[in-house]
């Protein structure tokens, strides 16, 4: 069996069906004796260019180990499913199990966002306490 990285884009109007599609595709691979090494749902993202007047798509990435037969069946499913607007299958030398760069970048962004929000909240709380103390002193 060979290792593959599969990315497919789902039409944004069909985003709610992504879970079922992923389940169906993973079942197809596992029933043929294959393995899912990594599954990442990147969510809705802006496309670099419009595809059939669609500017956003739901991205899903799979790293799998499967037979050629299972891969051909998966590609047929992509081809005949109108919700899948693009797909890419890349053969890999070995299984990739770590997080993708896309997911790492997203986590870094969310961590930075949280750090930016925390100091503002701490400063506003400190500022409120000092103001209330000043007003208490003014009353005395």
UniProtKB/Swiss-Prot annotation:
UniProt xrefs under Gene3D superfamilies: 3.30.70.60
In terms of CDD domains, this protein maps to: bS6 (cd00473)
**Which keywords appear in this protein's UniProt record, sorted alphabetically?**
Ribonucleoprotein, Ribosomal protein, RNA-binding, rRNA-binding
The keyword RNA-binding is annotated on this UniProt entry: yes
Query: Pfam families attached here?
Result: Ribosomal_S6 (PF01250)
Instruction: Report a single Gene Ontology molecular function.
Output: structural constituent of ribosome
Q: Which GO terms describe its cellular component?
A: cytosolic small ribosomal subunit
Query: Residue ranges under compositional bias (Basic and acidic residues)?
Result: 103-121
Protein name in the entry: Small ribosomal subunit protein bS6
Query: What species is this protein from?
Result: Ectopseudomonas mendocina (strain ymp)
């Amino acid at each position: 069996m060979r290792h593959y990285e599969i990315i497919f884009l789902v039409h944004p109007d069909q985003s709610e069906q992504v879970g079922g599609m992923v389940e169906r595709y993973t079942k197809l691979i596992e029933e043929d004796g294959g393995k899912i090494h990594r599954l990442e749902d990147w969510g809705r993202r802006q496309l670099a260019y419009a595809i059939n007047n669609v500017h956003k798509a739901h991205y899903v990435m799979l790293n799998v180990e499967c037979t050629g037969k299972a891969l051909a069946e998966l590609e047929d499913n992509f081809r005949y499913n109108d919700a899948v607007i693009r797909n890419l299958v890349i053969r890999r030398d070995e299984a990739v199990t770590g997080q993708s760069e896309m997911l790492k970048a997203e986590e870094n962004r969310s961590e930075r966002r949280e750090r930016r929000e925390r100091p503002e909240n701490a400063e506003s709380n400190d500022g409120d306490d000092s103001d209330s103390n000043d007003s208490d002193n003014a009353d005395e």
